[in-house]
Amino acid sequence: MTTRWWQAPLRIVQVNLQVVDTPLLDPDEVMRQLREELHANAVVFNAGGIYAFYPTQVPHHFPNPYLEGRDLLGESVEAAHRHGLKYIARVDFSKADDSIFHQRPEWFAKTPEGQPLAVGEPRYGPWSLLYATCTNGGYCGEDVAHPVMEEILSYDVDGLFYNGASYRVCHCGECRRRYREAYGEELPDDPGQFRDDWAQRSFVGNMQAIHRVCHALRPDVPWLGHYWLPDRMMHSVLRSHGLRLPAALGTYADVPCSEPADILNAGYLEKRPSWYSGMTARLGRAVLGGVPPIVIIHACTGMSWRHTTLPEHEYRYWLSQVVAHGGNLWHTLTGIPNTQYDRRILDVVGSFNALLERHEALLADTELVAPVAVVFSAQSIRETGPEEFLGTIEALLNHQIPFAFLLAEHLTDEGLAGFDTCVLPSVRLLSDEATAALQRFAARGGGLVASFETGLCDECGGVRPAPALADLFGVQCAGHYLRGQSSSYMRVEDPEHPLLAGIGPTQHIANQLDLLQVTGAHPAPLTLVPPFATPQAAGSPPERASIPTQRTGIP
């Protein structure tokens, strides 16, 4: 079988072009540097959207003011191919110059009061304002984005990447009309009151329309589509801006792509887990039938400090995980090599890519083999947060148990084939079809591990009379919660139980988990010891640290 170029091992370097550097850019020299010094085999360059990097004929497609008549897109594509590089064209229709807003205000995102949403304001220097565009508006659709993609695809580009692709909260007339048609009600002022699927419906619909235009013209050119591994940093953003459901990616993209930035400028306490880039790559392998995901790693320390780069060993560690977990690597630099303020990163990118180049044959056609499936349910995470999911990852990694992710939408006999055990980390929303597949899996001897609210609701969020897998686990749901269990414990009732192997001589395990009460046919190995004090009073004095209720029998 012939491997398409985007399924082979990739060493992508993105040059995030700054418009002021346009006169300094010699495409042939830049491509030589990327190929010979940084050992890239594919490049990402700006093409259109916020700025046109070629002589566009599309009305309201804002030209790069430093272009001075050049066709930088054409020059760059030709230079890339001369040096044996694949060329991925980057576009961004998420925002546009204020001069366009003044001509076509209906294309832009609005507050409930009808005001536009400025992006990146204030920005020092001689810059005009940028306004967020409406996902459902003409700028992101047939009036600008579609004809711009047609222009870009007239060049011999090898791939397409839409930066900033997301749903933007908007109360414009078009969004109000579509919402009314979809749900028979008015669009609420409060985004928290939007229907659950509104952001996703808007985002996916927009992406599918653009993909149809591109695929009709150049079916050989892959579209890179975003997915995310939810974490605490991204969860609130994804709730309001569309989940980018991995299961929907196949309807508008050919290659899964993610961006697990190591954001040092957020501070140590807000830093992402050390395994985040690797697990992002691993999730990507589950998205589009095993197509290797492309994982974007920013060389900078965060958007606040685009012109300083990550420490060498920090960056190498973040990169290494991507490759180790089956992903293709994409480095992002701010500017071309000759305009780098922090040039230390160039040696790191070059040496790391050279290592991958030497071992390219070993990295080709890899498969992820693991006995354990961890179910990823984006809808459940949206409802309950990512804590159970992230905690499951942490536990399996710490115990060095190999696992693969399985999308909730792939909970079928075929999807479960090859696994010995399936872990459901609070997969609250579970369809009847998925439940039946899990029951058959268990009947064949497969192991099931489920936590908290797994199976409490159907796939639409309707609460079930009993949790979907209650019969398999031998429990009945009492239907109410014990929350705020800080300063509580789990009492060890059966130290010989397999779940507690190696726990040692202790009666208590620390606990602060919310509890969904159940009753069961079998004795629980752990039961609740309720809090001995409120969180405010737990620390002092030690003379009052005794536990008033030693045993409840609550599992």
Describe the residue ranges of each PLM region:
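Aromatic-lined carbohydrate-binding/catalytic grooves of carbohydrate-active enzymes
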Residues: L34-L72, K95-L117, E121, V169-G184, ...
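Active-site-adjacent "subsite" loops/lids of carbohydrate-active enzymes
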Residues: T3, A8, T22, A89, ...
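Short, acidic/polar
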Residues: V20-E37, Y139-L153, H235-L249, P311-L319, ...
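Catalytic domains of carbohydrate-active enzymes, especially glycoside hydrolases
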Residues: D26-A52, S154-V157, L249-P256, W318-H325, ...
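Conserved beta-strand positions
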Residues: Q14-V15, A40, F45, Y162, ...
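Mature N-terminal, pre-catalytic/accessory segment of carbohydrate-active enzymes
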Residues: M1-S94, R212-H215, D220, D365-V369, ...
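Carbohydrate-binding surfaces of carbohydrate-active enzymes
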Residues: P9, Y87, G192-Q193, D197-R232, ...
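An active-site-proximal structural segment forming one wall of the substrate-binding cleft
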Residues: Q33, E37, A79, Y131-Y167, ...
